[in-house]
């Protein structure tokens, strides 16, 4: 689509680098996904709240999407602030481009680094299967955010982490550094003081 628009959003060398990271990441995902789900099912036995008996199924799903996003916000913010986690996450910010391919530029050990954060979800009583499915769906929205093709999305900008909001997160402009950590929702950034609207042209840049 970008080629049809005659936009230079992709570079061959950059995309091949992304593919290399993606292969390693997927190997780890395949190796750990089942184990992580089994671990969550085990933890679910010790749940603090029996949410399934307290709310209807649709509300359990809604809670899963919201709480997954909150935990991701915390994980993502710490990945920019804690040296060990940044060493894992920084590969995602190593591109000078902003395109769909960058969404797949994921660290090999990223899936493992998330485990200590997301284990809280089954412990508070969220069904592990629902958490797994809702998490996968949320990840798909995260892919959509890595593009320059989509401009602003009207009223959705108020509560969703839209592509324009996520371009800020990848921007090299000083006021954009370490902003907009949300994945599905932008409300956490607004609540916790890390929100920055997209007012200037964002220039993606690799970070040390």
What residue spans do the PLM features occupy?
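Membrane-embedded catalytic scaffold of the fatty acid hydroxylase/desaturase
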Residues: 23-32, 55-200
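Residue-level signal for inorganic ion chemistry
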Residues: 19
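Short, low-complexity, polar/charged sequence segments that are solvent-exposed and flexible
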Residues: 15, 41, 107-108, 187, ...
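Membrane-interface helix-loop junction between the first two transmembrane segments
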Residues: 1-16
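Conserved small/polar residues in nucleotide/adenosyl-binding loops
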Residues: 201-208
């Amino acid at each position: 689509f970008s080629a049809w628009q005659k936009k230079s959003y992709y570079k061959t060398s950059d995309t091949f680098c992304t593919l290399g990271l993606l292969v390693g990441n997927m190997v780890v995902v395949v190796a750990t996904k089942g184990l992580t789900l089994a671990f969550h099912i085990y933890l679910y036995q010790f749940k603090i709240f029996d949410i399934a008996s307290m709310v209807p199924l649709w509300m359990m799903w809604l809670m899963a999407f919201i709480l997954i996003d909150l935990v991701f916000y915390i994980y993502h913010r710490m990945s920019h602030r804690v040296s060990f986690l940044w060493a894992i996450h920084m590969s995602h910010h190593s591109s000078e481009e902003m395109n769909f391919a960058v969404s797949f530029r994921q660290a090999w050990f990223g899936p493992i680094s998330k485990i200590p954060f997301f284990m809280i979800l089954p412990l508070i009583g969220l069904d592990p299967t629902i958490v797994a499915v809702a998490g996968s769906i949320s990840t798909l929205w995260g892919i959509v955010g890595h593009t320059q093709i989509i401009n602003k999305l009207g009223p959705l900008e108020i509560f969703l982490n839209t592509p324009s909001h996520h371009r800020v997160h990848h921007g090299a402009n000083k006021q954009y550094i370490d902003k907009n950590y949300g994945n599905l929702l932008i409300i956490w950034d607004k609540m916790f003081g890390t929100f920055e609207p997209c007012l200037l042209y964002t220039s993606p840049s690799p970070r040390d």
